[in-house]
């Protein structure tokens, strides 16, 4: 449930708390703008990735499928500052060879990115949604991102990137599958 009025009131209160006049010309519409922005940034809250993965095709394909460099942005739940980067996903279809359209994997990323988030959990959620939705033999997810909470505040280290992974099934059990995936996502175009 998205409460636009509560967000507008909270933004107005925050502006007052930092000593600003929320009625001055440049800030009059800020509470409304922020509420609209949050509606977009957190639109994944009420979406179910299982719905996205429901439609698939049993093609008999049993080899690794990879989509890499899926761009995303999300909001860190600790400071409500953005983090952004790319997600790499690989999966190995099950015995039926069930695959999904590649845009479906990007949509799963979007659903989880558009929530208050931490990168580690996002990798886990994406991997779990894909292995549960596709019933595939294995899933690998790698996320590389730059966090504004490390750039704008605190330690102030621009350019540093956080890399997280989540491995399920055959990618967790098989060093060869894991190595092939990691090798393929590192290849340049």
UniProtKB/Swiss-Prot annotation:
* Naturally occurring in which organism (per UniProt): Dehalococcoides mccartyi (strain ATCC BAA-2266 / KCTC 15142 / 195) (Dehalococcoides ethenogenes (strain 195))
| Family the entry assigns | Belongs to the GTP cyclohydrolase I family.
Entry's EC annotation: 3.5.4.16
UniProt xrefs under InterPro entries: GTP-CH-I_C/QueF, GTP-CH-I_N, GTP_CycHdrlase_I, GTP_CycHdrlase_I_CS, GTP_CycHdrlase_I_dom
GO cellular component terms, semicolon-separated: cytoplasm
Any one of the GO BP annotations: one-carbon metabolic process
GO: which molecular function terms?
GTP binding; GTP cyclohydrolase I activity; zinc ion binding
Signal sequence interval, chain numbering: none
On assembly, the entry states: Toroid-shaped homodecamer, composed of two pentamers of five dimers.
Give the metabolic or biological pathway.
Cofactor biosynthesis; 7,8-dihydroneopterin triphosphate biosynthesis; 7,8-dihydroneopterin triphosphate from GTP: step 1/1
| Keyword line | GTP-binding, Hydrolase, Metal-binding, Nucleotide-binding, One-carbon metabolism, Zinc
**Name of the protein described by the UniProt record:** GTP cyclohydrolase 1
Annotated Gene3D superfamilies: 1.10.286.10, 3.30.1130.10
Binding positions for Zn(2+) per the UniProt entry: 76, 79, 149
Write out the catalysed reaction.
GTP + H2O = 7,8-dihydroneopterin 3'-triphosphate + formate + H(+)
The enzyme's main class, written as a single word, is: hydrolase
Tagged with keyword Cell membrane? no
